[in-house]
Regions:
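Primary recognition of RNase H-like, Mg2+-dependent phosphodiesterase/nuclease domains
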Residues: 1-130
């Protein structure tokens, strides 16, 4: 599954990442997915989602919501760190999201992904750079 959408009224990049993950978890839950892998280029977000301590920072409410969604709705989940240079698909989806006119225009792809990202995935699998 891939998704792109415009988020508004954000305070920082970590909050944007957390909101995107929370929205993705809600979609995956509604689709009945029991096993997921989240990939992020934000090490702080990965740590926040997986550590036992409660986060009392500016993004605490969003972190708690994402954790709750993970713990209650998925039998198996992994949160993986992927360095930004290796995460070209996320970069393309972010560019697509920025081009959307409003937050009501979110796009979700279950299997037939847009060409702009499917070419990147194909080249990554082949070990090439597009």
């Amino acid at each position: 599954m891939m998704a792109a959408g415009k988020l508004q009224n954000l305070q920082d990049p970590v909050q944007a990442e957390l909101m995107a993950v929370t929205n993705a978890l809600k979609i995956a839950t509604n689709l009945g997915m029991g096993k997921i892998i989240l990939e992020t280029d934000c090490q702080n977000m990965k740590t926040s989602l997986l550590e036992e301590e409660m986060d009392n920072g500016i993004n605490a409410v969003v972190v708690r919501e994402a954790r709750m969604l993970l713990f209650l709705n998925f039998d198996v989940y992994h949160v993986m760190y992927c360095p930004r240079v290796c995460n070209r698909v996320a970069h393309q989806l972010a560019q697509l999201s920025a081009s959307l006119e409003s937050s009501d225009n979110a796009c979700v792809w279950l299997d037939d992904f847009p060409r702009l990202v499917s070419d990147i995935v194909t080249s990554d699998c082949a070990g090439l750079v597009v």
